[in-house]
Amino acid sequence: MNFELTSAYKPTGDQPEAIAQLTDGVLQGVPAQTLLGVTGSGKTFTIANVIAQINKPTLILSHNKTLAAQLYSEFKGFFPKNAVEYYVSYYDYYQPEAYLPNSDTYIEKDLAINDEIDKLRLAATSALLSGRKDVVVVSSVSCIYGMGNPSDFYKNVIEIERGRMLDRNVFLRRLVDSLYVRNDIDLNRGNFRVKGDTVDIYLAYTDNLLRVTFWGDEIDGIEEVDPVTGVTIAPFEAYKIYPANLFMTTKEATLQAIHQIEDDLTKQVAYFESIGKEYEAKRLYERVTYDMEMIRELGHCSGIENYSRYFDGRAAGTRPYCLLDFFPDDFLIVIDESHVSVPQIRAMYGGDRARKINLVEYGFRLPAAMDNRPLKFEEFETMAKQVIYVSATPAEYELIQSEGIVVEQVIRPTGLLDPIIEVRPSLNQIDDLMEEIQLRIEKEERVLFTTLTKRMAEELTEYLLNNNVKCNYIHSDVDTLERVKIMDDLRQGVYDVLIGVNLLREGLDLPEVSLVAILDADKEGFLRSHRSLTQTAGRAARNVNGKVIMYADKMTDSMRLTIDETNRRREKQLAYNEANGITPQQIKKARNLSVFGNATSEAATLLTESKAYIEPSSPNIAADPVVQYMSKAQMEKSIERTRKLMQEAAKKLEFIEAAQYRDELLKLEDLMKEKWG
């Protein structure tokens, strides 16, 4: 199936030329191109048009989950009939394993997995292995982290066809091999149940059940059904069932891996003993031996990813498999906000290695743990055969890689001009700002301030609140979901002013903002570099009255570059508008575009309606004396019920309540171990 672009708009301004140049470059096999597009010029729409014309599977790489979600939503809108998937880290919380030798502190791995994102990740890999060409995967830097071997994943795909002869028990065993779990009582994602000749499979990568009906040893019917109502959604003549987990292996591979691990353990223990590290040798022997027993008995152990090289059959030092391996040979990578994303890709390997060196040197892990890692930057470059870098401020690396192939997109479809930039002295800057804020409030417009420190952002917020200005701040200490809510509140008018440090830059789509104030603009550094100033100024480019005020006592090179480049673009935009009789139009954009439909607004509602914490809202189950007299089956049922309550509370963002259920769960599990082992 080919890509089918759906949009009420047609390419205008610089877009038609940009689309043509980028498309020609990709079709001619040009390895790297750069799209230099100003804020609000429709870069996403341009890329969507390129994808539709080249008809290749495409990876869109963004530097954080929030922007990835925004892009996913936009591409879903452009390609409703095609496979647009989302692949980011599925951890709601992740504390990596680490050892701090200075204080002799071992930090155990701790995590919480988001079930919904896990489903979306599986949907992405399943779409890529389906053989479709019309696949767009929007991803964060997670795409370069290790995952299962795609060939092992594909070997466990179950193909069924109506009318084919297939023993039902053989089919059930194949489901188990694909890591589906039988559960005839409570069917959840990744489970299946059997009722007579009917097998219901809750697919791990969709929200639907697959119902397979047998007539003896013949497949009589295949249909997707609604898991709640049981109503048939669609019948099928044939169907591919993809595995329930990204990490697949076989019994033979597991046994071979255990033998290799034990051989390497013997060598590493002997090495530690030869250099006088008897304690490390003993620690390593005990930990790895315990892990091997767990794998033999249960098929997994805590930290099994550190043995991934053995299960994948890779040689020492070779790169891990990652999402890029699931793409066909001929695919396109689009790196959004490349001036930030590329350095992030480059840094991942070094950070991971620095943490694991201590774990290996002090006997917590085998050296093979070093091979459970993200790609090195050089490995990523080798796999990225065709790349389009997208940025309003591309860095030197992108320009060198593109070898001069830079496609400029300066004209906005709305006719909006780059904002006017004024430089004002820092003396009495707050009084000056108060006057500017009042002017914007009268017009029902919004204001962004950017400061150099979190403390300054908080103190400025307090000052403005004391002067009856509706405002709030966002910085790295404010969690992601709360940031989304605050920015949405700004658009709604709950706040007139938003103050931040480094979060008011790439990708924030706030058309109501007509003024951006940059405090301490002359303090050269990361936050006041040419690229940072240009990106920050761009936040005012989506408003017809857009204006930027830089408060500074001297003109720095970064300020001069930003002002000169902005003026050059304004001249080009003005000339185009005059030549084509275009009057700038204010952008009007719907709020709350989200990965999960209206999840952002639902989350915001849940946040505002959260229960006040006064006392535990449910009785302490583990403290109930009746628990001591429960049978094993009753205890297991109680544990499962508590786990579900915890997950439901977390889904509703009732985190205090979820934490209470978590504590109950741990107590019940401890009681279970005490009584039955």
Where are these regions (language model features)?
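Conserved strand-helix element at the start of the C-terminal RecA-like helicase core
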Residues: P57-A69, Y86, K277-E280, R440-E462
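Short amphipathic alpha-helical segment within the helicase RecA-like ATPase core
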Residues: A69-G77, E97-Y99, E459-Y463
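N-terminal cationic and glycine-rich segments that engage phosphates or anionic surfaces
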Residues: Y87-D432, E436-E442, T461, Y495, ...
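Conserved helicase ATPase core of P-loop NTP-dependent helicases/translocases
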Residues: V478-V501
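Walker A/P-loop
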Residues: Q28-V50
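Pre-Walker A (Motif I) flank of P-loop NTPase domains
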Residues: L27-T34, K56-P57, K133-V135, E445-R446
